[in-house]
């Protein structure tokens, strides 16, 4: 099972084996005068990144830039650990996320509260990054990594307030993190394309997500590079599915939230409903109900999505009176 995939002559993706599963989360390697990595996943994935860089014959001291789209732990939890191995690298991050990379105390506390005894296996260690090695980027900022390759940063909230997307001039592609959803690429071998919104708590904002999608759409890119997982050139289908699934998720959540006062019960009901809706959609397209994707990823992700939607609706106070 290969851990590296060549996407273009100057772009690779390393499989981070997030949750010990292939094609879950990836780290992108952009070649140029200043070698650049986008996304770090969590610290248990850093050895996979280091092995991938070694396989690509990239010296760790040659890496100049490490970019995270946002500071959720499956995208940036390993940044501190990775940077201890890359002495010449600078971390690029949204202004709202920078302080958590410099002092990850709140990230650690939050993760331990959610994951308990599983924290060490999933995320440990989360290491601080010296402030002088952190560079804040925002809307319209650019980073030239080669004479023919400039990265442009865009503020793309919706999944998180501190989310950036990165346009790559060389490939006319954009690294979107979780802004326009998750790509279940392993289903393509069945002839199925599935892109689902990621509505995780606590900063999910559907209107902002759709506005960010429109911002990305306006760039007329040829390719979208997902945090989860890999590249899609069928960009119009990405946008279409986000526009389809996001209202489905929200309306399902609203119906449950209006009648269920207990938030834990509402979360569970919504997670089950979302799972059943997506599973039904996939079985109609020939994906067997025994496929490992259902048990290992979809159930987990629909639970996280449900929590984000219920939290959003709670903030709106659209619940029972």
PLM features: residue spans?
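Residue-level marker for buried hydrophobic side chains located in beta-strands
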Residues: 36, 67, 91, 173-175, ...
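Metallo-beta-lactamase
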Residues: 42-44, 62-74, 101-157, 161-233
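Metal-dependent catalytic neighborhoods of phosphoester/phosphodiester hydrolases
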Residues: 77-86, 104
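Active-site/pore-lining binding-face segments in mid-to-C-terminal subdomains
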Residues: 207, 212-273
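C-terminal regulatory/interaction regions
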Residues: 251, 255-321
């Amino acid at each position: 099972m290969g851990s590296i995939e060549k996407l273009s002559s100057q772009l690779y993706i390393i499989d981070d084996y997030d949750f010990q599963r292939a094609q879950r989360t990836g780290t992108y390697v952009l070649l140029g005068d200043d070698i650049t990595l986008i996304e770090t996943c969590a610290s248990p994935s850093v050895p996979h990144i280091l092995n991938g860089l070694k396989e690509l014959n990239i010296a760790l001291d040659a890496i100049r830039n490490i970019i995270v789209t946002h500071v959720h732990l499956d995208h940036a939890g390993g940044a501190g650990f990775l940077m201890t191995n890359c002495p010449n690298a600078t971390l690029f991050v949204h202004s709202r996320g920078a302080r958590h990379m410099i002092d990850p105390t709140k990230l650690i506390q939050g993760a331990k509260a959610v994951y308990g005894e599983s924290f060490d296996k999933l995320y440990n260690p989360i290491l601080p990054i010296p402030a002088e090695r952190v560079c804040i980027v925002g809307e319209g900022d650019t980073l030239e990594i080669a004479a023919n390759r400039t990265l442009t940063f865009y503020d793309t909230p919706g999944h998180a307030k501190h989310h950036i997307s990165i346009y790559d001039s060389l490939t006319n592609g954009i690294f979107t993190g979780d802004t326009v959803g998750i790509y279940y690429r392993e289903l393509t071998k069945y002839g199925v394309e599935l892109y689902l919104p990621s509505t995780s708590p606590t900063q999910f904002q559907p209107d902002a997500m759709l506005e960010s999608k429109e911002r990305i759409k306006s760039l007329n890119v040829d390719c979208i590079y997902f945090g989860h997982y890999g590249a899609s050139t069928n960009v119009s289908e990405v946008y279409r599915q986000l526009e389809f699934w996001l209202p489905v998720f929200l309306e399902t959540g609203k119906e449950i939230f209006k009648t269920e006062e207990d938030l834990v019960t509402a979360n569970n009901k919504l997670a089950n409903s979302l799972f059943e809706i997506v599973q039904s959609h996939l079985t109609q397209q020939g994906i067997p109900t025994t496929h490992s994707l259902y048990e290992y990823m979809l159930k987990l992700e629909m639970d996280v999505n449900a929590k984000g939607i219920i939290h959003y609706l709670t903030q709106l106070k659209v619940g029972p009176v």
